[in-house]
Swiss-Prot record:
Protein name: Proline--tRNA ligase
Family under the similarity heading: Belongs to the class-II aminoacyl-tRNA synthetase family. ProS type 3 subfamily.
Any one GO molecular-function label of the UniProt entry: proline-tRNA ligase activity
Enzyme Commission identifier(s): 6.1.1.15
SMART domains per UniProt: ProRS-C_1 (SM00946)
Subunit structure: Homodimer.
One GO term describing the cellular component: aminoacyl-tRNA synthetase multienzyme complex
Note on domains (UniProt): Consists of three domains: the N-terminal catalytic domain, the anticodon-binding domain and the C-terminal extension.
Annotated keywords: Aminoacyl-tRNA synthetase, ATP-binding, Cytoplasm, Ligase, Nucleotide-binding, Protein biosynthesis
Amino acid sequence: MAESPITARSQDFAAWYQDVVLQGDMAEPAEIVKGCMVIKANGYAVWEVLQRELDDRFKATNHQNVYFPLLIPQSFLKKEAEHVEGFAPELAVVTVAGGKELEEPYVIRPTSETIIGHFFSKWIHSYRDLPLLYNQWANVIRWELRTRMFLRTTEFLWQEGHTAHSNHEEAVEEVLRILDLYAQVAEDIMAMPVIKGVKTHAEKFAGALKSYSIEAMMQNGLALQAGTSHDLGQNFGKAFDVQFQSKEGQLEYVWQTSWGVSTRLIGGLIMTHSDDKGLVLPPKLAPVKSVIVPIYRKEEERAAVLEAAHRIAKEIGAKVDDREGQSPGAKFFHWERRGVPVVLELGPRDLASGKIVLKRRDTGTKEPIDQSEVGAKVAAALEDMQKGLYTRAKDRMKANTVLANSIEEVEAILKDATAEKGGGKFVMAHIKDEPACDARLKEFKATVRNIPLVDEYDGPGKCIVSGETIEKRAVIAKAY
């Protein structure tokens, strides 16, 4: 696509985000299909890295990949009352197929707990069949009215884990293990700090006993739910009659979990690290970590510069941008907007001096280095950039996290925050998990994001709405 100016974050954060996605060649709206997007090669390559990082960890913890049908009988969703109520507004329903009206409509998968519950009831009979640890890579449809690329679209890609266990303790261990796994990928690979915590009743997954999440702070101070892990208890086991014979010979219902992350992570990545020049990718997540741009003016310089560029690229695993008809400046601009961590400049003078110029995407600094040290220098720059991006994001979260001891304080802090103008904060306050408290926060468009598992603050205190004693502070914020 044609290169266009990128809106400054300070001017309009939402427009800036849209510009970075488009100019980074990550995705574009699919205007012909309402609420959907086309994930372009650059964006999908980032998703593939995330897939590999997650999939390797799933398999290391004995999970197997499976695939279940996209179409789910509508009656399945009605078997779990809270589940169908939670998803009803987002459902896409197929009523006609093969030119004929269907006897029973199919729902296009919004999530797979119901259809997996059906098959679990066929496969699980004894405690020897447990635990059953499955993961599915899939697309889902949730009919969204207000969409934003990667963050909220009618169709999106994700993984959804589904497990069955013989007892509740084991299921809870699984839920927390996966929550830790998600946090590890977010922080170690994406350089995106997160808060692990339990969701309130109003924010939990429809049909779960308890839901947990990782919450990240974007540069505008708004929260992004980056991943969830759910303790389903025996709700779906009872709804789909998933029973097993225990070691003691008793017939019992299984305990289940489900958990997932999606292409929404890419939106979180962009809003955590990118700048007014365009996309910034953490090295561990970047599909292309370094690019060499050959610079020459005369035809007689071309062969020597290109030969050296390809030789060095082979040594360090870099890409050479040897496209004809593009100036070096246009090439630098191209890779800057696409978030490549390191760009190396190589020209005739560099050849003569045995040097090459290393430019970092995060700091914009340029450094001439010896060609003999290029491998070590690039590796060091990538490692330093990965750490630096995490530290910068962590410091931002810390600087924009505040304590409040009254609902008036919370409202004053958050009421003017918007996705466009920023000004968001994470407000740590004691608040009771009940509808009246949720309703009070809703008055200024805030929610409880989660109640952190690790209490870094001051323990029990008075609820900011009811005045009752609450064990620990929750994260209150405006969110995507």
